[in-house]
Amino acid sequence: MLKRSMNIADYDPVLWQAIQDENLRQEEHIELIASENYASPRVMEAQGCQFTNKYAEGYPGKRYYGGCEYADIVEQLAIDRAKALFGADYANVQPHSGSQANAAVYMALLNPGDTILGMSLAHGGHLTHGASVSFSGKIYKAEQYGITSEGLIDYDALRKQAHEVKPKMIVGGFSAYSQIVDWAKMREIADEVGAYLFVDMAHVAGLIAAGVYPSPMPHAHVVTTTTHKTLAGPRGGLILANGNEELYKKLNSAVFPAGQGGPLVHVIAAKAVCFKEALEPEFKTYQAQVVKNAKAMVKVFKQRGYNVVSNGTENHLFLVDLVNHGLTGKAADAALSRANITVNKNAVPNDPQKPFVTSGIRVGTPAVTRRGFNEEDVAELAGWMCDILDSMNKDNHEQVIADTKEKVLAICKRLPVYP
């Protein structure tokens, strides 16, 4: 029998310890992985609610199971808030992840073997934008565009490539691009070749919601995003569109029943909370600070002699090219991690290293900004990171790591994730 008093600590102490250790890790480490963030206690409360128990196949008002009247309220709340947040006529809040949202868009608009044109993973795209190891590169004929040696999208080259390969869909969006994307230009190119423009805005959705990064909504046929990352919600996906009922029906059918069964109603409840939080005025302040912090960090890295891909950032992330310092991304990632600074290794343009080694690191500011870091704090942090990188392969490396870790623990104590 079930009792409210049941808990993990008594029943499964090994699992409980892992949870406690992760809580401590998050509090005592500075999180600079661009795709990570901290969900609010309200989001986590919703995700742990009793909607965990409810099957709700179908959509609000059209369910295959009974007892869905409250699930309908929750899902409709999430839909309405998502539409208001991004200026969309249509929203599907059921995708379990960003990748599943993307898969649904492909299924709705393409046939197997159709040509897609997306940004290369090695140049800052995403697995689902046509990488050979992804469904997007296996089911569809994937062509890839890249960035210049300066780290920028060459729209003239993209136009030429689109006219040559004649894609059914052009995919916009990225996982490691630090500049503004010209969505209008991409739509112009798509229209020239009769292609759909599909934008995956997962990395910058929070910035877009706050108005600090241009929205693709006026230009794209369909837009997807994750609900974590800069949106700081639960892990999940979202599809948005401004079009017509025929398009919306195709998208709905591609999510359910084609791609998924029952939605995760407890996660949809958490998405509803996330969207409400993102509609608050303080969310705009937070997102503006995310960009300010990224720019402040870039300034320090450049002053210390490190190359930043595209020479700067206009969003929440940037790539540090370590080639001229003779370092690999893998080694830099490991060294910073020992000082409780978490980044991820990342390929840079024309990277001479293998994908699991790389010549760069990706740095993002959503999580550190969420816990209260300002420009002064992140500038100091960037200096500590440069100290560690400068000391690699030198006699004082271990001491620099030890000294930096002390500073990291002190600032984490001053600015806790969950005070």
Curated annotation (Swiss-Prot):
Its main location: cytoplasm. Its cofactor is pyridoxal 5'-phosphate. InterPro entries: PyrdxlP-dep_Trfase, PyrdxlP-dep_Trfase_major, PyrdxlP-dep_Trfase_small, Ser_HO-MeTrfase, Ser_HO-MeTrfase-like, Ser_HO-MeTrfase_PLP_BS, SHMT-like_dom. Its EC number is 2.1.2.1. It comes from Histophilus somni (strain 2336) (Haemophilus somnus). It comes from the Bacteria. One of its GO terms (cellular component) is cytosol. One of its GO terms (molecular function) is pyridoxal phosphate binding. The keyword ATP-binding does not apply. This is Serine hydroxymethyltransferase. It is an enzyme of class 2 (transferase). (6S)-5,6,7,8-tetrahydrofolate binds at L121, G125, H126, L127. The record marks H228 as: Plays an important role in substrate specificity. It catalyses: (6R)-5,10-methylene-5,6,7,8-tetrahydrofolate + glycine + H2O = (6S)-5,6,7,8-tetrahydrofolate + L-serine. Homodimer. Pathway: One-carbon metabolism; tetrahydrofolate interconversion; Amino-acid biosynthesis; glycine biosynthesis; glycine from L-serine: step 1/1. Catalyzes the reversible interconversion of serine and glycine with tetrahydrofolate (THF) serving as the one-carbon carrier. This reaction serves as the major source of one-carbon groups required for the biosynthesis of purines, thymidylate, methionine, and other important biomolecules. Also exhibits THF-independent aldolase activity toward beta-hydroxyamino acids, producing glycine and aldehydes, via a retro-aldol mechanism. PROSITE patterns: SHMT. Pfam families: SHMT. Belongs to the SHMT family.
